[in-house]
Amino acid sequence: HKITTGKAENKFGVSYASAPAVYARAAELGAIDVAGIDMHIGSQITDIEPFEQAFRLMAELATRLKSEGHNIRHLDLGGGLGVPYRGTNDVPPHPDEYAAMVKRTLGHLGLKYVLEPGRMSVGNAGILVSRVIYVKENEGKTFVIQDAAMNDLMRPALYGSFHRIVPVSPRPGADRAWDIVGPICESTDVFGRDRQMPPIAV
């Protein structure tokens, strides 16, 4: 999956099993202040269980590292709570449920906690407004080219994610299918394909 970060096939971090040896090596270097543990298990997570499993492992690791003489003072807990996107029945944990789980699994350690709760709290807070610069009719396809591009909103091109697209001032007339695209010379510069909307013009 494109947004997982905590599996063996992902390029990030070090494995749980190898972490004690990495910390021991860092401590030997002398100039490094081994202050904490940072972890991130992925994005768009809508189930509390993966967090709880990961945080319990972090509690075990922190306890072990402290027993080995490392001055562990903080845990940075990554893994994003998901947004309920169209076409899914996923409901992310409520922030209160998440907070209670953090306290239950890690509260006894008495460390500083840095939380990376993901896009759930802000994912639906913003909009991208663009202007139609050209409507291109091809055989069987109509492209609405706008002045925003994949560099402004990468998620549809990168992940194939769905974002709602609506005209600011809808025109009268029957809905039809439009491909909403950006002007970049890149085939993946697409915001939505076959979107049903009323007439669109420059």
Predicted regions: what they are:
Residues M101, H108-V202:
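Charged (often Lys/Glu-rich) extended helix/loop segments that serve as interaction or gating elements
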Residues A8-Y16, K103, N138-F143:
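Acidic, His- and aromatic-enriched active-site or binding-groove loops in soluble protein domains
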Residues M58-E60, R64, Y98-L109:
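Alpha-helix-loop-beta-strand connector modules within alpha/beta enzyme cores
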Residues H1-H74, V83, G87:
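Active-site-proximal beta-alpha core segment in soluble small-molecule metabolic enzymes
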Residues S43, L81-V83, S121, D152:
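Feature marks short, surface-exposed loop/turn motifs that line or immediately flank catalytic pockets
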Residues D38-H40, D76-G80, V114-E116, D147:
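A cross-family glycoside hydrolase active-site/sugar-binding cleft signature
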Residues D47-Q53, P84-E97, G123-Y134, R195-Q196:
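Short glycine/threonine-rich loop-to-helix capping motif typified by GTGT followed
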